[in-house]
Amino acid sequence: MQGLHHFVPTDLKAAYINQLLKVGFDTLDFGSFVSPKAIPQMRDTSEVLAKLDLSGTATKLLAIVANERGAQEACQYPEIQYLGYPFSISETFQLRNTNATIAESIERTKAIQDLCTAHGKEL
């Protein structure tokens, strides 16, 4: 969804994810807490989360984060069980995707792991 040029309305995203929640997946990557300048499509992740019906599902939610700021935001939501960090074996892709080298990303994930531990989340 992040590659789409037109903004997908929040209600449509939530309706789609609510349908996926009915399937019974173990884990669902539902959104990202990243800079809206970097990925405008994900600017409404908090609003999408608020519209999800988690009452009849055992599916766990995973949010992608690319830095500590995103991890801090994601950790504020008890509905989110997992945080994901976009790692690549390609230095070029890692830089383009996270604005950090692989070595810097390793350090970032250490800080993100500390946040996860403090908030009962998994990375």
Where are these regions (language model features)?
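N-terminal small/glycine-rich loop or linker at the start of catalytic domains
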Residues: 1-5, 84-97, 120-123
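Alpha-helix-loop-beta-strand connector modules within alpha/beta enzyme cores
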Residues: 38-63, 104-123
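Hydrophobic faces of well-ordered beta-strands that scaffold small-molecule active sites
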Residues: 3, 26-30, 59-65, 81-85, ...
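Glycine-rich, proline-tolerant flexible connector loops at the mouths of alpha/beta enzymes
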Residues: 26-52, 85-101
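Active-site mouth loops of central-metabolism enzymes
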Residues: 1-14, 59-68, 94-102
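Conserved N-terminal beta1-alpha1 strand-loop-helix module at the mouth
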Residues: 1-30, 41-47, 54-58
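Catalytic cores of alpha/beta
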Residues: 66-78
